[in-house]
Swiss-Prot record:
One of its GO terms (molecular function) is GTP binding. Residues 160-329 form the OBG-type G domain. One of its GO terms (cellular component) is cytoplasm. Residues 1-159 form the Obg domain. Keywords: Cytoplasm, GTP-binding, Hydrolase, Magnesium, Metal-binding, Nucleotide-binding. Residues 75-84 have a biased composition (Basic and acidic residues). This is GTPase Obg. It comes from Desulfosudis oleivorans (strain DSM 6200 / JCM 39069 / Hxd3) (Desulfococcus oleovorans).
Length: 333
């Protein structure tokens, strides 16, 4: 399924049904009074968080959503049937914006959260309501209230505890695949990952936590180079970043270059994101020469704690998982 994280749709509630003009007509009651029933209410339009959804793919082709109208009232004081509410399901982390003004309407984050966006129109009153002592046969009724219509822009920002960042081919997708049940595309070439992936990491006796793998960034991403910064929004909600570096590709002439490039791009996108706590991880330690290059990076960067792992062989991965869990727990307190 293609990853879709933005969509613009037009939504409407249902209009209220018209009130009925009717008079009681029964044998031996030649001049029965008005008995027109009320119209039914139109259906409301709601947005609901569905935790099983991970993309806005459902809105790729369908752009119009309308709740049913209320039915008109009937004789014998029968109220018309109300229109059913229309529920639009969205993934957790969906932002709803006014398409015209850009103002944020709602941030849908809580599981099973319901947001009544457009209320259905009330049904019109039947003519039974308008009889008076001086006007006992009203031949009019109220129309139902009109529907409400709006155009909204939906934007998805994944809800993850940890975000994986790094240059292309650093091994982010491989790491995600070994620490979770996620199965992202993996290849030995840059830009294998073309959209974010989300995985749940589990530890024995502990609450699982979510990790997002973001497509690799390159220098100049904030100006649109490579895949640009379109997907960086998906780690804005994270509490922690894992900065993954390919140890085997470190340049001895400038060992800190990969680290510096990514952090510069983060700062260009969002100063707040650049200040997010980071765990620095040197990957591909199983490759020839990686150990010496990793030491050069550590010396040049002056980082006190750095994890040395091989996602391919899973060396050091369990220790990393435990450390991430401990950090997340400490940030909760």
């Amino acid at each position: 399924m293609k990853f879709i994280d933005e969509a613009t749709i037009t939504v409407s509630s249902g209009k209220g049904g018209r009130g009925c003009v009717s008079f009681r007509r029964e044998r031996f009651v030649p001049r029965g009074g008005p008995d027109g029933g009320d119209g039914g209410s139109g259906g409301s339009l709601l947005f609901r968080v569905n935790p099983s959804k991970r993309t806005l793919y459902a809105f790729r082709s369908k752009k119009q959503f309308a709740a049913p109208n209320g039915a008109p009232g009937e004789g014998r004081q029968k109220t018309g049937k109300s229109g059913d509410d229309l529920v639009i399901e969205v993934p957790p982390g969906t932002l709803i914006f006014d398409a015209d003004t850009g103002a944020i309407i709602r941030d849908m984050v809580s599981p099973e959260e319901d947001f009544v966006f457009l209320t259905g129109g009330r049904g019109g009153k039947g003519n039974k309501h308008f009889a008076t002592s001086t006007h006992q046969t009203p031949r009019f009724a109220q129309p139902g209230e009109p529907a409400q219509t709006a155009t909204v822009r939906l934007e998805l920002k994944l809800l993850a505890d940890v975000g994986l960042i790094g240059l292309p081919n650093a091994g982010k997708s491989t790491l995600l695949s070994v620490i979770s049940a996620a199965r992202p595309a993996i290849g030995a070439y840059p830009f294998t990952t073309l959209s974010p992936n989300l995985g749940m990491v589990t530890l024995a006796g502990a609450e699982p936590f979510a990790v997002a793998d973001i497509p690799g960034l390159i220098e100049g991403a904030h100006t649109g180079a490579g895949l640009g910064i379109r997907f960086l929004k998906h780690i804005e909600r994270t509490r922690l970043l894992v900065h993954l570096i390919d140890a085997s590709a470190i340049d001895p002439a400038d060992p800190v270059a990969p680290f510096r490039i990514i952090n510069a791009e983060l700062a260009m996108f969002s100063p707040a994101l650049a200040e997010r706590p980071q765990v620095v991880v040197l990957n591909k330690m199983d490759l020839t020469g990686a150990e010496a290059l990793a030491q050069q990076f550590i010396n040049a960067a002056g980082i006190k704690k750095c994890f040395l792992i091989s996602a391919a062989t899973r060396s050091g991965v369990e220790e990393l998982k435990k450390h991430l869990f401990e950090l997340l727990c400490s940030h909760d307190t």
